[in-house]
């Protein structure tokens, strides 16, 4: 692979990673420990490897029409997660709120990586080199998720409980933006 072929993949990796960054800003406003931030970022990175890989494999056999379905599903997941964060912040006390672990972490990581599935579909049809592409997507998304989570964590310290509500609203807004791009 030449450098000229690698540049568009790097740009795509950052574009997909910005989704993870934006959503992680909101998630970072939840009460998270550094260990959880590390684990969340790694999980997002792994999903950004798995999802485009599946997309690339399927993209070699399926038409592009499924990209819209993946886009819609990712938006709905983000909106649902955002409402959950707002709900848990307003209606539950501090002890009952849960950090994104277990199934909620996988739902979160799936939601922010679903766009990479549709990109993988397109790249699979195009015939891009699979290993380089998925590793690049995973690494960049993991790095940007960590940055977003850490910035969100510091913003939460400044905003308190309202920061968590703002984080949930950011997720809902981002999901709505995916559904209805301006």
Curated annotation (Swiss-Prot):
Q: Which GO terms describe its molecular function?
A: manganese ion transmembrane transporter activity
Task: Tell me where the transmembrane regions lie.
Answer: 6-26, 37-57, 71-91, 101-121, 131-151, 162-182
Q: Which InterPro entries match?
A: Mntp/YtaF, Put_MntP
Subcellular location, in the record's words?
Answer: Cell membrane
Tell me if DNA repair is a UniProt keyword of this record.
no
Q: Which GO BP terms sit in this record?
A: intracellular manganese ion homeostasis; manganese ion export across plasma membrane
Q: Which Pfam families match?
A: Mntp (PF02659)
Domain of life, source organism: Bacteria
Bilayer topology annotation = Multi-pass membrane protein
Q: Name one GO cellular component term.
A: plasma membrane
Q: Which UniProt keywords apply?
A: Cell membrane, Ion transport, Manganese, Membrane, Transmembrane, Transmembrane helix, Transport
Q: What does this protein do?
A: Probably functions as a manganese efflux pump.
Task: Tell me its family.
Answer: Belongs to the MntP (TC 9.B.29) family.
Q: What is this protein called?
A: Putative manganese efflux pump MntP
């Amino acid at each position: 692979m030449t450098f000229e072929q690698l540049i568009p993949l790097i740009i795509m990796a950052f574009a997909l990673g910005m989704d993870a960054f934006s959503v992680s800003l909101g998630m970072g406003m939840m009460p998270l420990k550094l260990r959880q931030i590390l684990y969340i970022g790694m999980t997002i990175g792994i999903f950004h490897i798995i999802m485009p890989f599946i997309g690339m494999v399927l993209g070699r056999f399926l038409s592009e029409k499924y990209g819209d379905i993946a886009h819609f599903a990712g938006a709905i997941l983000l909106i649902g997660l955002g409402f959950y964060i707002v709900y848990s912040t307003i209606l539950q006390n501090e002890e009952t709120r849960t950090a994104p672990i277990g199934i909620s972490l996988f739902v979160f990581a799936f939601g922010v990586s679903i766009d990479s599935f549709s990109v993988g579909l397109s790249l699979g049809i195009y015939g891009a080199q699979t290993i380089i592409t998925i590793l690049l997507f995973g690494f960049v998304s993991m790095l940007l998720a960590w940055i977003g989570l850490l910035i969100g964590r510091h913003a939460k310290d400044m905003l308190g409980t309202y920061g968590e509500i703002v984080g949930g609203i950011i997720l809902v807004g981002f999901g709505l933006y995916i559904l209805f791009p301006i």
